[in-house]
Amino acid sequence: MGGKSGWQALESNPETINPFLKKIGVSGVECVDVYSFEDDLLQFLPQPQLALILCFPSSEAREFLSKQYEEVEKNGTKPEGVFFMNQNEDIGNACGTFALFHSLANLEDRLNLGKGKFFKWFEKAKLVKEDERSDLLSEDTDLAEAHDETAEDGDTEQSDQVDFHFITYVNKNGKLYEIDSCAPFPRPLGATSDSSLVKDASVAIKELMENVQNLSFSAMALIGK
């Protein structure tokens, strides 16, 4: 998503994200492409399915998503106990990284976060207020270096105007949450499991796709290993 100059945009593919996970010290998980949300194809996805990262055209989707979050707030169903932070404008085009970090942070009991760059930031981020976490991230030179090294290894030409946004769908203690760094809070979407997360998330994703007249969507599943 577009923003101030800062961290470069990561490509939304496993060839980029999996090496980045290693650079920041995380193991026990890998990204795989999700090519379709049709039931007959989803059955071939590996398990356990821990999270799903979605990339989509930002400007077309923002109005629709805003209405979804307004409905959650109206109904008083804002969740508690979910790690969340808003995107810091100083970081710039790193909404893909926010989606990935939201996934990892809410799966800390399912993954090996190691003792590396992500773990060191996360241990500090858990102790500060929600609105201070992205500032803490923007000040983390170790993560910024690993992030930009990975971005520079990609094939896509960098631009300050990136009109795509990333959000994640995470299984947190058997409940599915949509986490968007540009939204006011995580959105609860009901029950889920390690075998059905992508299918469960596809309900919300298909609704989003139907309301956006643009087919430029891509998705990656985070699979435990």
Outline where the language-model segments fall.
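Cysteine-dependent deubiquitinase/ubiquitin-like isopeptidase catalytic cores across multiple families
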Residues: 1-225
